[in-house]
C-alpha cells in the first residue's frame, strides 16, 4: 500500500509539473480588431493575474521574449504587436489613422477581444502613452503599472526631443524627411547598445526591428507617429492627474543611461504616486536586452506585495 501511495504521489507530481510546463510555454496567436489582424504572444496560466506588455519603437512583442518565460510561472502574460509593428498587419494609411490615440483604441479593443477584465501593465517607450490612455479610460481594470523607460513627464525627455518639438511646431515636408533617420539601421543599433555593458546586447533584436520597419509602407507610418508623438506630450498633465486620482501601484524600472527618456522621468513618478517604487539598472533604452533577469525579479517582488488584494 505504501508503495502504491508513493507511486500515486509521484505520478501526481509529474502531472502537475507537466501542466505547469505547458502553461509556461510561449504561444503565438492572432486576433481580428477592426480591419487589422493583431499578432500577440501569450504565456502563463490564464487563471493567474494578468500582465499586459506593451512594446516600444521600433520594436515588437519580440522584445519580451526573455522576460515572459521568467514571469510565466506566477503570471498570465499577453504581449500584442501594434498595427504596423512586428507581425501585426499594416492597414493602408488612406483608410487607417496612425495616431497614438487610434493605436490605443486598437489595444483597448484587443484586450476586450481576448477577455482581459483586470490586468497589470508593463509599458515601455511608445507603449507607455498607449497604456496610460487605457488606464485613463478604464481605471477600474488596472491592477498595477510597471513603467520601464515609459515616460509621462516633461523633465523625462532627453535632449533629442528639442529638435522634435521644433518639428511639431513647424511640420514641413523637409523636416519630416529628416526624421527618417530615426529608423535607420545605425540609429536602431544605437538605441539598443548605447549605455549598455559592452558585449551584453546581441544583434537579434535590432536586426529584427530593422527588418520589420523596412516592410512596404511602414516608413511613412513611422513618420506619421513621430509627428503624432506631440499628442502624448500634450496629454502628460492628464496622465499625471490619473496617477494622483487613482494611486495605482507603480514600479518604475529605468535603464539609467537612456538618452531618450532620462532618469528624471522615473523620479518624477514619486511626485504623483508617493508610494511608487523607483529602481535603476546600469543599462540603456532597451534595458531588457541586458538586464531581463534583474527586471523580472523586481517585477516579482513588486507584484507579490501589490496584486494579492487587487485581483
Language model features with spans:
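Bacterial Sec-dependent N-terminal signal peptides
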Residues: 1-22, 311
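Flexible "cap/lid" subdomain of the alpha/beta-hydrolase fold that forms the substrate-access gate
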Residues: 23-38, 43-46, 50, 78, ...
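Structural cue for short, hydrophobic secondary-structure segments
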Residues: 53-56, 79
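Active-site glycine-rich loops that stabilize anionic/oxyanionic intermediates
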Residues: 56-59, 125
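Serine-hydrolase catalytic-loop signature spanning alpha/beta hydrolases and amidase-signature enzymes
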Residues: 58-66, 77
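Active-site machinery of serine-nucleophile hydrolases
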Residues: 72-81
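Catalytic histidine-centered segment of alpha/beta-hydrolase-like enzymes
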Residues: 284-296
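C-terminal alpha-helix
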Residues: 298-306
Amino acid at each position: 500500500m505504501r508503495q502504491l501511495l508513493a507511486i500515486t504521489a509521484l505520478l501526481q507530481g509529474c502531472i502537475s509539473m507537466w501542466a505547469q510546463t505547458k502553461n509556461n510555454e510561449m504561444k503565438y496567436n492572432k486576433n481580428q480588431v477592426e480591419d487589422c489582424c493583431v499578432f500577440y504572444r501569450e504565456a502563463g496560466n490564464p487563471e493567474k493575474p494578468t500582465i499586459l506588455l506593451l512594446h516600444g519603437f521600433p520594436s515588437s512583442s519580440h522584445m519580451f521574449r526573455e522576460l515572459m518565460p521568467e514571469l510565466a510561472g506566477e503570471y498570465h502574460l499577453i504581449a500584442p504587436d501594434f498595427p504596423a509593428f512586428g507581425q501585426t498587419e499594416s492597414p493602408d494609411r488612406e483608410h487607417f489613422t496612425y495616431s497614438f490615440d487610434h493605436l490605443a483604441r486598437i489595444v483597448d479593443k484587443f484586450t476586450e477581444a481576448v477577455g482581459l477584465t483586470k490586468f497589470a501593465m508593463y509599458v515601455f517607450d511608445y507603449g507607455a502613452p498607449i497604456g496610460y490612455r487605457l488606464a485613463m479610460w478604464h481605471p477600474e481594470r488596472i491592477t498595477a503599472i510597471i513603467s520601464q523607460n515609459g515616460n509621462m513627464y516633461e523633465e523625462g525627455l532627453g535632449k533629442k526631443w528639442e529638435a522634435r518639438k521644433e518639428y511639431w511646431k513647424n511640420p514641413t515636408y523637409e523636416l519630416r524627411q529628416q526624421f527618417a533617420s530615426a529608423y535607420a539601421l545605425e540609429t536602431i543599433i544605437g538605441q539598443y547598445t548605447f549605455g549598455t555593458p559592452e558585449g551584453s546586447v546581441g544583434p537579434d533584436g535590432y536586426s529584427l526591428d530593422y527588418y520589420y520597419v523596412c516592410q512596404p509602407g511602414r516608413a511613412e507610418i513611422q513618420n506619421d507617429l513621430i509627428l503624432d508623438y506631440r499628442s502624448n506630450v500634450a496629454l502628460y498633465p492628464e496622465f499625471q492627474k490619473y496617477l494622483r486620482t487613482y494611486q495605482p501601484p507603480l514600479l518604475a524600472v529605468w535603464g539609467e543611461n537612456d538618452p531618450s527618456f532620462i532618469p528624471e522621468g522615473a523620479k518624477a513618478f514619486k511626485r504623483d504616486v508617493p508610494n511608487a517604487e523607483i529602481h535603476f539598472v546600469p543599462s540603456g533604452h532597451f534595458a531588457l536586452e541586458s538586464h531581463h533577469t534583474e527586471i523580472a525579479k523586481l517585477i516579482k517582488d513588486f507584484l507579490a506585495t501589490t496584486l494579492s488584494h487587487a485581483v
